[in-house]
Amino acid sequence: MKNYSKNATHLITVLLFSFVVILLIIPSKCEAVSNDMQPLEARSADLVPEPRYIIDVPPRCPPGSKFIKNRCRVIVP
């Protein structure tokens, strides 16, 4: 009879432990799913800060050319 009660106690302990683990895991999974359901713009806005100051720097052209009308043009002498 002792053996059965020991097995039952062990079984109840394992079941309670697994129940507690499930209760801890399920809310975090639900939160991850709700974050995935948000639009991409809403998620990326939280992650990437917008640059405050945008400085317009003209691109550098190779020697012998100039930046004309948004392109590097070769100057022919």
Swiss-Prot record:
Entry GO terms, CC: extracellular region
Q: May I ask which residue range the UniProt record assigns to the signal sequence?
A: 1-32
Which cysteines pair up through disulfides? They are: 61-72
Choose any GO biological process term that the UniProt entry carries and state it: venom-mediated perturbation of biological process
Major location, coarse class? secreted
Sorted keywords for this record are: Antibiotic, Antimicrobial, Disulfide bond, Fungicide, Hemostasis impairing toxin, Immunity, Innate immunity, Protease inhibitor, Secreted, Serine protease inhibitor, Signal, Toxin
Give this protein's Gene Ontology molecular function annotations.
Answer: serine-type endopeptidase inhibitor activity; toxin activity
The source's domain of life comes to Eukaryota
Query: What is the annotated localization of this protein?
Result: Secreted
**Can you give the propeptide residue ranges?**
33-52
Tissue expression remark: Expressed by the venom gland.
Give one Pfam family: Secapin
Q: Name the family the entry cites.
A: Belongs to the secapin family.
Main role? Serine protease inhibitor which exhibits antifibrinolytic, antielastolytic and antimicrobial activities. Displays antimicrobial activity against bacteria and fungi. Likely functions in the innate immune response to microbial infection and possibly in the venom, as an antifibrinolytic agent. Not toxic to mice but does induce slight sedation at higher doses (from 40 mg/kg). At a dose of 80 mg/kg, sedation occurs 15 minutes after injection and is accompanied by piloerection and hypothermia.
Q: What is this protein called?
A: Secapin
Species annotation: Apis mellifera (Honeybee)
Recite the lineage of the species: Eukaryota, Metazoa, Ecdysozoa, Arthropoda, Hexapoda
